[in-house]
Amino acid sequence: MHRRNFIKNSSIASAGFAILPSGTLFANNKIVKVGVIGTGLRGQDHLELLLKRKDTEIVAICDVDEGMLLMAKKLFIDAKKPLPTIITGSNVAYEDLLKIAAIEAVIIATPWEWHAPMCIAALEAGKYVGTEVVLGTTLQQHWDVVQAAEHYKGHVMMLENVCYRRDVMAILNMVRQGMFGELIHLQGGYQHDLRGVKFNDGKTPYDSGVEFGAKGYSEAKWRTNHSMLRNGDLYPTHGIGPIAHFININKGNRFLNICSFASKAKGLHQYVVKKGGNTHPNAAVDFKLGDVVTTSINTANGETILLQHDTNLPRPYSLGFRVQGTNGLWMDINNSLHIEGVTEKHRWDKAQSFLDKYDHPLWKKYSNDAEGAGHGGMDFFVVNAFIESVKRKINTPMDVYDAATWSAITPLSEQSIQLGNQTIEFPDFTKGKWMYNTPIFALGDDY
């Protein structure tokens, strides 16, 4: 069955099929043959990591941007590695990459609107799929990817690197050891001034002008269009991924309801006017994305979650994590925590000594390997987990149900805002399997 007909015609008779559980096959010496779809700046990060590994061979790369392909080729030359097959020419050129039988796994690092169709095509081709966030742009796309993974018995891992951030993993270790007691409330989000990413001069990627779309470069070429046309939490997974692990979402717990609010939208217009002047054509653009989008979620086990998306205003970077339980809490903004009976009453304590004490076994084992990898080492861990899963032919530690659940917050938040901040029932992508699944993420120091 061709994927173009799959979504339309299939009734997904295998809707009850469970993604294959982790196995025991260990293949340390195996060389994984990889294809990379999307060689923009993020795709190049993945290429650099893969080129440093002894257990991967990059067979082919694909992009429609000749300039980005040239930059990607230089990475191979600098690493003294053979050049891969280079595939380009059209928006569907990736289909030719997927026809290469030798490729076992693909990494997708393209604009968001391409993630879902590329995931489905890769699943049909029998490849392991590692996709950059987000999974899709519509709720139906999320269901389509889940159903394709079930139908083709495939694996999709969202490459959410913040799940591997060192402090986040130490807190996960503390949560699992009961240091915070029973968890009650969690917060997180994406709070990052992206104005200099959403606009540039069309030649350099950051802080260089006020162009976007056809006149933009790199992310400004496509990402800003979402801020112009959509209003919701467009990038929820950096916050919700770690939170989901803290409270075992899809592994004995699930999201029940979601409600979102958006502030007025002023930041992007003001940025354009300040840098480009009132007469610049982009000063007349009506950006739909609220400057601060706030989302509330409740869960089957009774926790509450608060997410914030804040990318249009001047601010320092912070994901705004808060993990609060019956024994105390941690907040990342001031790197502080309070644990009843351990820290001084009614006072914050610096978190670092606790983070050191409860450093996750993965970081203890691989910190030297992660040194120099992107985003403070997080990128090493997320790519390593994906490649190790392919080598062992097992399910990935963050699976297609996780990808869909975390990423679906975007279209659900849009829907809630469009309906006047209505509370919406959260879909169960696992179709009840969440009640029987158990945690598999980062249980030891393996991967």
Task: For the regions a language model picked out, list residue spans one by one.
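N-terminal glycine-/serine-/threonine-rich beta1-alpha1-beta2 phosphate-ribose binding loop
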Residues: 1-131, 143, 147-155
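C-terminal helical cap and adjacent loop that interface with cofactors, partners, or active-site loops
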Residues: 10-13, 45, 244, 259, ...
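Predominantly a Rossmann-like dinucleotide-binding segment in NAD(P)-dependent oxidoreductases
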Residues: 38, 42, 152-155, 162-286
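Active-site beta-strand termini and strand-to-loop segments that position acidic
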Residues: 295-301, 325
